[in-house]
Design a protein with these regions (language model features):
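A short acidic/basic microdomain associated with nuclease active sites
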Residues: 59-73, 77-78
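Conserved catalytic cores of phosphodiester-cleaving nucleases, focusing on short active-site segments
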Residues: 79-81, 85-94
């Protein structure tokens, strides 16, 4: 059964089953980050340092992180995050330039319906516009999780499409 065909509790149960597989081993540098083979297979990936850095930020925010292998030629999410028994699938998008969020979110929808944006700084008005546009254009999108420095912000579809999104998000983002 394909993971994409599952919804709700069945989807969460399948993620829990995947995360519970014996092939996942904790990384020596962090007991809350797991990967297939303990990181040996991932460490040759050129994206490994940024994947590991974002995983470490997730651990700081209370998640257990399961780093998923990325087979060549296939678009797959990067992580399973678990916190308080809730399992979620995320695709990492590092944001390093201006006017790039829209493009990175567009790329992520092919890999999953939750995106993780790891960013140092970004124009709030542009970010609000890009996130709202993402949820309007892609009805399957569920959540955008943002790591900005030591802060974590979760944006759901409902929040992004609400009338007060800009004001509430600005208050949280510009702390």
């Amino acid at each position: 059964m394909l993971l994409k065909s599952l919804e709700g509790a069945a989807f969460g149960a399948k993620l829990k089953e995947i995360a519970g597989r014996k092939e996942f081993h904790a990384l020596p540098e962090s007991p809350f980050i797991y990967s297939i083979g303990g990181g040996n297979q991932l460490s040759s990936d050129p994206d490994y340092p940024s994947l590991l850095m974002a995983a470490q930020k997730a651990v700081e925010h209370g998640y257990r992180v399961f780093m998923l292998p990325n087979p060549h030629g296939l678009k797959t999410p990067d992580y399973i995050f678990e916190r308080r028994g809730v399992y979620k699938l995320f695709d990492l998008k590092n944001i390093s330039g201006k006017n790039i969020v829209h493009t990175r979110l567009k790329e992520s929808i092919a890999q999953g319906n939750r995106a993780l944006l790891n960013m140092p700084q970004y124009n709030t008005r542009k970010l609000v516009h890009d996130i709202r546009k993402y949820f309007v254009k892609y009805p399957d999108a569920i959540e955008v999780l943002i790591f900005k420095g030591k802060n974590e912000m979760s944006v759901s579809r409902r929040f992004a499409l609400s009338a007060r999104f800009y004001f509430e998000f600005k208050r949280m983002f510009e702390k």
